[in-house]
């Protein structure tokens, strides 16, 4: 038997928001048991859907579009219950004045983009003219009235560039929470259904390893922040606040939020409004 193929092919998002899910794996040596692929959320989602990965993070929209082929891991996700800090709309004008205005999308991450579009159209009653471009805030603001940013670029805009340039920074997680009263889920961890059926024991072990890593990282969040601050443009306190602002749970409230998001955007985004989310069984 090809021994290397018994190691699960696991995805890893190269954003700060996923560091607490992987930091503990490195500490325990569990990473040695994985064939790890690092990339952006969009690329990892594509690889999981295509079958190039067995297990990994998948953006919520891509998960819902491919729910028949994927099984979600319970109690692990990247989300928020209120502000998220790293998914933002940066604007030069109030959001309700963006009708017909140019809005730059600094990411192809369908979930954050669909959330921003949903909020602007249904909560603020505007239909901007959207276009996609690299996530460089100063360039975006030369051509657009507002910009949608995610991940580390959004964190920089939120903490550094927005205040420096005198721009309004609107947190997508906070806007959603104010509007619906619900948390939000940006990405879930999932296994391909065919892999989970073929390798149920390994799949459950990977799930358990991620939960243990998440728990260890949050218990030692100051250490995680201290290490991350060595190579990031943020100080330890900012990173510790960020890691504890993020919500890495995926339970009943988060499932309710997924149901509500699907109801609102499913038919225009490529999945049924009542799409079913299947969770990995213990």
From Swiss-Prot:
Q: What happens when the gene is disrupted?
A: Cells lacking this gene require menaquinone-4 (MK 4) for their growth.
In which pathway does this enzyme or protein participate?
Quinol/quinone metabolism; menaquinone biosynthesis
Single GO MF descriptor: hydro-lyase activity
- InterPro entries, from UniProt? Menaquinone_biosynth (IPR003773), MqnA (IPR030868)
- One BP term from GO: menaquinone biosynthetic process
Q: What keyword terms does UniProt attach to this protein? A: Lyase, Menaquinone biosynthesis
Q: Does the keyword Lyase apply?
A: yes
Reaction equation(s) it catalyzes: chorismate = 3-[(1-carboxyvinyl)-oxy]benzoate + H2O
EC code(s) of this entry:
4.2.1.151
- What does the UniProt function comment say about this protein? Catalyzes the dehydration of chorismate into 3-[(1-carboxyvinyl)oxy]benzoate, a step in the biosynthesis of menaquinone (MK, vitamin K2).
Q: Which family does it belong to?
A: Belongs to the MqnA/MqnD family. MqnA subfamily.
Q: Which HAMAP family match?
A: MqnA (MF_00995)
Stated name of the protein = Chorismate dehydratase
